[in-house]
Swiss-Prot record:
GO cellular component, one term: cytosolic large ribosomal subunit
GO biological process, one term: translation
SUPFAM superfamilies to which the protein is assigned, alphabetical: ClpS-like, Ribosomal protein L7/12, oligomerisation (N-terminal) domain
Protein localization: Plastid, Chloroplast
Alphabetically ordered keywords of this record: Chloroplast, Plastid, Ribonucleoprotein, Ribosomal protein
GO molecular function: mRNA binding; structural constituent of ribosome
InterPro entries on file: Ribosomal_bL12, Ribosomal_bL12_C, Ribosomal_bL12_C/ClpS-like, Ribosomal_bL12_oligo, Ribosomal_bL12_oligo_N_sf
Cross-referenced Gene3D superfamilies: 3.30.1390.10, Single helix bin
Protein name: Large ribosomal subunit protein bL12c
Length: 128
């Protein structure tokens, strides 16, 4: 590069954002160009070879009982029994051993609904 170009580049490096914006506006007015069209064209050309990765949506979920406050244990126990079909003793053991997986392989809607039921009863649940 010529010394003149090098000096211009060094001067541009010292500009603030406001000064750079004013410079772009002045160049657009002086030379009758549109910098936004050139910038977007460059972005499109640079982005063209990028490979688009497909994001696979999860279809099966596991329902985890994360936490049960002591004062909400009975309400959560009832919900766990209705969701799992467990007997009283088994459901009680499951609730008391939180965090614990309650159900696995649920569809998205069923998992969300079960999570809402546990949370409505006062427990904390998550989907994995």
């Amino acid at each position: 590069m010529s010394e003149k170009i090098d000096q211009i580049v060094e001067d541009l490096k010292t500009l603030t954002l406001l000064e750079a914006s004013e410079l772009v506006t002045k160049i657009e007015e002086t030379f009758g160009v549109d910098a936004s069209a050139a910038a977007s064209g460059g972005v499109v050309m640079a982005a063209a070879p990028a490979v688009v990765e497909e994001v696979e949506e999860k279809t099966e979920f596991n329902l985890m009982l994360d936490e049960v406050p002591a004062d909400k244990k009975i309400a959560v126990l009832k919900v766990v029994r209705s969701l799992t079909g467990l007997g009283l003793k088994e459901a009680k053991e499951l609730v008391e051993s939180a965090p614990k997986q309650i159900q696995e392989g649920l569809g998205k809607d069923a998992a969300e609904e079960a999570k809402k039921q546990i949370e409505a009863a006062g427990g904390k649940a998550s989907l994995t």
